[in-house]
Amino acid sequence: MIRLGLYSLLASIALVLFAQCTSGKSSGSETDPSGDSAQVAAGVVDGKLVFPPKPSMMVSDFAGVLTDSIRGLEDDLRRYASEVPIEIMVVSMAHIGDGDVWQLAHEMGKRWHLAEKERAVLILIVPKSPDGSAQAAIFASQGIRHIFSETYCRGVVSNVMQPLLNDKNYYGAAAATVEDVLKTLSNVQL
């Protein structure tokens, strides 16, 4: 518990520093070069959602809930990317304020240029929403959206992820979702 709290504190400090460096002020806002004023988050800073640039890692644990498992999950995702090929990213965010987790996943996919890729999936985990429950969403790129429709993704969140998230097994939820995505892809001709 202490370790998780320390990682959450460090992640919050890093987000504040990131927001100050990228915006030049302490408001935590970020200007989108496309002119789109929608904001999504890696956390809430000064009451505003902060969205980081696309990380180089396939696992971004902004919430500090995957800390012991990141290396193994990162290695697995890189191996899958070379074998399948598909880019799967797992992102955890400490909180998203009143934001909609599905809209955030979609916006993150667009901003990180996953949307136009042939095969990319983003798995977003928010361990604590305003109502206290964990939330998750799955975003699929345009090239595989016919396989991973919104209905399919919502079903995976409800049936695969949510039971594990309710038990605070965030790594298990991410790993089970990755497994489900790969199993589904293996049953479909791309």
Regions found by a protein language model. Give the residues of each.
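A structural boundary signal for the start of the first folded domain, especially the loop/turn
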Residues: 2-6, 16-120, 127-190
